[in-house]
Amino acid sequence: MADETVDTLVIGGGQAGLTMSHRLKQRGIGHLVLERGRIAERWRSERWDGLMFQFPNWSVRLPDFAFPHADADGFSDTAAIIAFIEDYATFVTPPIRCGVEVTKLRRDAGGFVADLAGGSIAARSVVVATGPYQRPLRPALLDDHPGLFQVHASSYKNPAQL
């Protein structure tokens, strides 16, 4: 038996999870967003120093919320993107719990149950909005060379690491 029940559970508090929360609220659908870190955590902890967003500012937007910029054709840095996502969260006011990690998701008769470190939540439906690249993928060939230095983009910060 789950400790809590919601209609829809959204896993992930980045731009996709916040957008889903916004759309669910607009439709009057009860939901809860769970984020393992802070809002926009992967932008904070899994990006390298000096990263510039790969799309021009004019193309950056979230539903009902434009990206404020001084140069439409420019590219924003990570701090500006984090601030934008935080501002969007303030605009959306999602029912969110940060610092909560889903350790397992399983089906049950009523939908799904998400296991957490401190309990469980049942939901009729679940949206997984964790992004496509949570786990580094390294070629198995590299296992044969344990002394070979490797760094994945998710943990790279700057040239001093190399």
Q: How does the language model describe each region?
A:
Residues E4-V33:
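N-terminal Rossmann-like FAD-binding beta1-loop-alpha1 element of flavoenzymes
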Residues D77, T130-L162:
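Glycine-rich dinucleotide-binding loop and its adjacent helix/turn
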Residues I29-E35, W43, V128:
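Short beta-strand "acidic-cap" motif of Rossmann-like dinucleotide-binding folds
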Residues C98-F112:
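A conserved short coil-to-beta-strand element within the FAD-binding core of flavoproteins
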Residues G30, E41-A83:
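Glycine-rich active-site loop/strand segments that organize a redox cofactor
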Residues L9-I11, S120-Q134:
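Short hydrophobic core segments
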Residues A79-I96, V102, A160:
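Helical element adjacent to the flavin cofactor pocket in flavoenzyme catalytic cores
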Residues E4-V6, L116-S125, L162:
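Core beta-strand elements of the Rossmann-like FAD/NAD(P) dinucleotide-binding domain
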